[in-house]
Regions:
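Structural motif
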Residues: 63, 110-112, 144
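Solvent-exposed, non-transmembrane alpha-helical starts
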Residues: 129-131
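Surface-exposed, charged secondary-structure patches
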Residues: 88-127
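Hydrophobic pocket/interface hotspot
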Residues: 48, 59-60, 67, 79, ...
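Short beta-strand edge/turn micro-motifs at domain boundaries
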Residues: 25-26, 134-161
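Short, low-complexity N-terminal intrinsically disordered segments enriched in polar/charged residues
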Residues: 21-62, 162-164
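Bacterial Sec-dependent N-terminal signal peptides
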Residues: 1-32
Length: 164
């Protein structure tokens, strides 16, 4: 009888040790600094606008090689090269002296900070500072090699449609 009690007690002790050793430790959550990310994304938008306004679209280091961009009245543009070619075409009809500016209004990073949705607006002003176009955009970024790069974006004008 004593032997059975001893074996039962030993079994309880072994099971207790096994369950205690198998408890999962809580992994601390990655802290994502939204303000720092928003500042980083706004700096990318500012660099994009500066290159666009200077007519140097090849200097725009914003899109991934396999990015897809969606715009009003166009088929989706697939790939960085197609997006840059479209920008070059747009610049041919971009008003002389006009400037585009982008504003990051919201960011929504993933819990680990490796993916990010940006919601923003844009405004085009002529040489006198008068607004000639404006709209909104949404962009999806992925972090590659420590830097965000746009993999998808979509934009639309909020100006009234002109009749053809």
């Amino acid at each position: 009888m004593k032997n059975s009690i001893f074996k039962g007690g030993l079994l309880v002790v072994i099971i207790s040790f096994m369950t205690a050793c198998n408890q999962k430790k809580e992994v601390p959550a990655v802290m994502v600094d939204k303000e720092a990310i928003k500042t980083e994304i706004q700096a990318m938008e500012n660099a994009f606008a500066e290159s666009y306004n200077n007519g140097t679209t090849d200097a725009i280091n914003y899109y991934a090689e396999d990015a897809v961009s969606f715009s009003n009245g166009k088929m989706p543009l697939e790939g960085k090269k197609a997006i840059h070619e479209s920008m070059k075409t747009e610049l041919l009809t971009f008003p002389k002296g006009a400037k585009i500016a982008f504003e990051t209004q919201e960011i929504h990073p993933s819990n680990d900070g490796n993916m990010l949705v940006e919601i923003g607006g844009y405004k085009v002003t002529d040489s006198t500072g008068t607004k000639v176009n404006s709209g909104h955009f949404i962009s999806l970024f992925e972090k590659k090699d420590g830097k965000y790069i746009c993999i998808r974006d979509m934009g639309n004008s909020d100006m009234p449609m002109t009749k053809k």
